[in-house]
């Protein structure tokens, strides 16, 4: 899902912060500092990725389109993984949060397209996501 035509600029590759055994990356969203969390955290061979939405700077990518949002979210997850020396194929679990019944099928079809060969464990939830424009949020775990 290349949505680059929606964006004027791309963020630079995330640079990990190393604190002992922990490597963390932050994407620069205001929520990370406000709520005190990392976009992704690597400890040993395990990588945990926080809930990720279709946010680019102050722009919501794929507004009103759960398929586009899902592809963009997975692109962000993939960039986070690559920043920590992993790849999308290292994902072993995802959790997909969808706003409502109208968007679940499109979100899961996009998830299925991107993870067709990987087939991680997955749980899907209906959730009252923060911000009405967000239709999909995804958490992921990887093992390298």
Located regions from the model:
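N-terminal presequence-like segments and the immediate start of the first folded domain
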Residues: 1-75, 79-92, 98-144
């Amino acid at each position: 899902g290349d949505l680059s035509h929606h964006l004027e600029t791309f963020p630079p590759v995330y640079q990990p912060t190393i604190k002992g055994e922990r490597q963390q990356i932050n994407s620069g969203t205001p929520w990370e500092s406000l709520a005190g969390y990392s976009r992704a955290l690597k400890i040993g061979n395990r990588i945990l990725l926080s809930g990720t939405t279709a946010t680019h700077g102050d722009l919501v990518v794929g507004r009103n389109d759960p398929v586009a949002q899902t592809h963009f979210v997975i692109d962000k997850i993939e960039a986070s993984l690559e920043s920590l020396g992993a790849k999308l194929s290292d994902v072993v679990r995802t959790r997909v949060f969808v706003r409502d019944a109208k968007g679940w099928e499109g979100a899961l079809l996009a998830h299925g397209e991107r993870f067709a060969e990987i087939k991680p464990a997955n749980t899907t939830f209906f959730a009252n996501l923060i911000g009405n424009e967000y239709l999909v949020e995804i958490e992921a775990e990887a093992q390298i």
